[in-house]
Amino acid sequence: MADAMDLAQLREQEDRERHISNARSRRHEVSAFICEECDAPIPEARRRAIPGVQCCVTCQEILELKSKHYNGGAL
């Protein structure tokens, strides 16, 4: 028999999966084939996984780190 913690974890997992599904279905943007920052090709797997992607992984990481830094986030 499931206890309260098991039920809470199941509910949390279901919520997370629902949120991921909703986020993926909302995006109908066209992905770029070439990174807008460095002109490197963006792999097909990345374009399929993240609809609307405009940057390669490396450039996206740099943009996120800069954003975190400029917005006062800790590095």
From Swiss-Prot:
InterPro entries: Znf_C4-type_bac, Znf_C4_TraR, Znf_DskA_TraR, Znf_DskA_TraR_CS. Residues 9-20 have a biased composition (Basic and acidic residues). This is Uncharacterized 8.5 kDa protein in gpA 5'region. The gene is CP80. A zinc finger (dksA C4-type) spans 35-59. It comes from the Viruses. SUPFAM superfamilies: Glucocorticoid receptor-like (DNA-binding domain). Residues 1-23 are annotated as: Disordered. It comes from Escherichia phage 186. One of its GO terms (biological process) is positive regulation of secondary metabolite biosynthetic process.
